[in-house]
Structure formats: C-alpha cells, structure tokens
Amino acid sequence: MNGAELGKEICDSFKQGCKQAGTDAEITLSVTDLSKTPAIIEALQNMGKVVLKKAEKDSSVCAEFARSATKAENYGGNNDKEGYTNMVDLGHLAQNAEGLIGESKAQIEKALSDAIVYKINGDYRRHASGLSVYYSYDGDQESAARYQQIAAENIYSSFVNYSIGANISDEALSESGVGEVQEV
C-alpha cells in the first residue's frame, strides 16, 4: 500500500465514523501529494503579486479581497464566539476573488488539482477544494506577523498583513515588483 492508498483509507474510514456519529455533512479531509506543494506556493505567491500590484494604485482592493475571503469556505468558526483559526479554503477563495486575481485563479486550481490526490467533503462543505491557507479573519496583526514568520511564501502573507493595516517589508515589495502601496 502506498501513501495515497493509505490516505484514501484514512479518509474513507473517517467518513464512515462521521456518518455513524451523524456529523458527516460537516466533514472535509484530503490526501495531498507533498511533492506538488512548490506549485501551490508559487500560485499563492502569484496571487499575492496580483493583489499587491492592484493595491499599489487602490487600497480598496483589500476590502474586495476580504469580501471574497468572507464568502469562502472557512474552517474553525472564525468568529468571536467560536474563536479564530484564520483558515480559508484556497480553491473557494480563488473562485470568489476571480475578478480580482485574474489568471492566478487558473494557476491555483491547476496546482490544487495536481496536489490533491483524494478528498472527501460533506454537504455543508461542498466548496472544499482540499487545501486551506491562512487569512486573517480576526484582523489580529500579532497573529498575522507570527504566521508570516513561518509562511512558506512571502508575498501573499505580506498582502494579508497589509490588508489589516500592518507594514509590508521592503523585501516583499521588491519581490512583487511593487514600489509602494497606499495606506489602508
């Protein structure tokens, strides 16, 4: 049995257990080929470049992107009552932000399609693409800064920080080809 087959077995047994418990409508779980993550990181970086470039001229891009994230499948409550995990489904975010991110949407969808070997999701998670990423639903600059320290990429996480009023590093501006962004 290889890793993908084992992952499928884990997903299917998890689904069966959730079905028995009556919670299968809420589930989402996927098997990811980690050798494909560089393409996902590149797609995420490119999405960050696109939105930062647009923010260079118009900071309302942040509000538009936030609306896309708010409408997207997200995980862990992300509200004051339940707390915040600040995790958004990458595929659904890209789908919602298509008008803003343009061709980055197709790049994200391709990277996800290549990397997600198997996935399950219940009726309440029908937009789950198989992979979630950080998005600051709570607007906490401290947690956003901590995320950026461990992020595998720099530009998307810099955009998230910028969108909640934090500074963008000169390195991220340089990498994205942006001279300066407007104040949020």
Give names to the regions the model predicted.
Residues 1-184:
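Terminal, contiguous helix-loop blocks that mediate binding/assembly
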